[in-house]
Amino acid sequence: MQLLMLAAYRSEKYKKSVKFLFPSSIAAYGMPNLKVKQKAGTVKEEEWDIPHTMYGCNKLYCEKLGMYYSQYFGQKHLDEKPPVMLDFRALRFPGLISAFTLPSGGTSDYGPEMLHAAAQGNRYSCFVRADTKISFMAMPDAIKSLLMLMDAPVKSLSSRVYNVAAFAITAEDFRQRAVNAFPGAKISFEINPRRQGIVDSWPEDIDDARARTDWGWKPDYDVDRFFDDYFLPEIRKRYSLVGSH
């Protein structure tokens, strides 16, 4: 809030709108149960914004604050000559995966954790069901989307908050990729009810048509290119060094 207030005051004082870019998350969504999630399929930005976690609540809260400071700050939009307000823009990211950093225990990290374990010849117990499905994205695409939204002309934007998507796959899809890449990988499914409940509250996929239309969003990495050209080559490099020093 402090940063938003500062940006809003500077926009008004210097009569030039400050761009404020915020990384939001699919955690801002909240589906009531698995049946509703599966029926909903691909979800738009304004649908099912009822998060089940404190993390998701805070992401949604920041989105709403950004909208307020961009449009209604102090109700000054009602003035005869409204001041210049800040230019808030947010991206709702899916599960982000980097080939260069280790997964750190996030709720969507079961996929990369599985592959890191398989590459090292370690057993892995996945904490969600095999059929669990959500959207994921390669880190280079996440960076690309941030830069694209930052550079987009304000006149082309129809929203303050945009979904961006790349590919949606199941935990079983990750397991199959791990087994194919590292034969003999030992992966089981041991469900953690609380973590499963969180992932079940997130949509299977997100609709990013608005971003594609408004500012030309398109990911570089589909599911095959993500694994074959980005993630697996770097994982192999990382663990080929184990024990070599």
Segments from the language model and where they lie:
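Conserved active-site helix of classical SDR/Rossmann-fold NAD(P)-dependent CH-OH oxidoreductases
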Residues: 2-3, 60-67, 71, 111-112, ...
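Conserved Rossmann-fold NAD(P)-dependent oxidoreductase catalytic core, especially the SDR/UDP-sugar
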Residues: 3-54
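Active-site Tyr-X1-5-Lys
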Residues: 31-35, 50-89, 118-120
